[in-house]
Amino acid sequence: MGRFLASTTLAFFAAGVPAFAAEDTCGTITIAEMNWASAGLAAWVDKIILEEGYGCEVGLVAGDTMPTFTSMNEKGEPDLAPELWVNAVKEPLDQAVAEGRIVIASQILTDGGVEGIWVPTWLAEEHGIRTLKDALAHPELFPGAEDESKGAWFGCPSGWACQAINRNQFLGSDADEKGFELVDSGSAAALDGSIARAANRNEGWLGYYWAPTAILGQYDMTRLDLEAEFDRERWDTCIVKPDCADPQVTEWPASDVYTAVTSEFAQKAGVAMDYVKTRSWSNDTVNGMLAWMVENQANNEDAAYEFLERHEEIWADWVPADVAEKVKAAL
């Protein structure tokens, strides 16, 4: 604790980058520090390991999914986006990979991004709730609706793409006819607050959430089985659309989350590229670190040092032994 302060894409994984193009030296690297916590944490972990372990000069640049991808694709910078959610940029990313401008270095989240409908684990175990159908049979267990005679299904914040998806899942499951009301959480903070409030009151909660996130690191939640396979055609033509004429429940698609680099970086970065190709972690690991960030009001840099001190068993496998020793000496 020394410092507290897509199929086309997969075909072009970095394992196929020619070895002769790489150099043994590291040089100067730019990394996107994306504007959500898990990606910001990853950027700082990369920065510390590359600087302290490999002697690179690393600069962080502010980023977000689409602006960062566009800049990498059109300008060749920054060199590296640690956490790129592929579903958000799938078509242009596939094209950029196919045309040789972007290389997928690794799958940073081994579980992928996970979305779904969740309930508290204690409630699921106490009442035998495993599926969405099980939960919808008990509106009395889920307070929070404006109409107190109904159960609450907490949906996505206003303006988010998942708002329409949740509405259609709500309608497709006939939740309204089963005594539920779809609650507009208004904002991410309000959605988080509804989960925290239910936990503090030992009350039930049902609604949309995703991982990795701090909330799922703080509270033990169970993702419900929707008992419906993912249907790509139904998803694309109806579920994602606000005017879906015939909503039917379908499972959320898996969200591939990759580290992407520019082709120039892949060819010239040498040891840095070797490192990036090996680096990945689980949602449980990230959930725990994000929860620590919230509980300690820590920033990305603080959390990166905490991760390196707490989880040597994870990151030491990403690097050679001599590099690991250099990183440990810097903590």
Language model features by range: what are they?
Residues 101-155:
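A conserved helix-loop-strand patch within extracytoplasmic ligand-binding domains
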